[in-house]
Amino acid sequence: MERKIEEFYHKWKNDIIRKPLVLYGAKQIGKTFSVLEFGKKEYKNTVYFNTDNNKELLGVFKKERSTEKIILNLSLLSGETILKDDSLIILDNVIENDIIKGLKIFGSEHSKYHFIAITSKKEK
């Protein structure tokens, strides 16, 4: 049985004007599981970051404002090659506004990189 959220993910992935997706919801309801499953099915590779106390990751989004430098740093941190249009980058447990702000440049400049940020905290 396919979940309604999977249909939403497919529409998001195929949208011409795709922006980073911020998935907000209560804790422990399956957000991360559903995104990881979607990544396994739909992408060549899935790059997962748990942002809890990840100072290196936070530093990337605080310091860099170039999409290419952010992608390069994420590749180095994960040890994975991030492919345009064929990698899903998951940022889990996002509570830092700097990460959300950093993702906004991918909405305005590059829709070739597929980001999903998962949080249980509403952005202020």
Regions found by a protein language model. Give the residues of each.
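Phosphate-binding site recognition
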Residues: 1-124
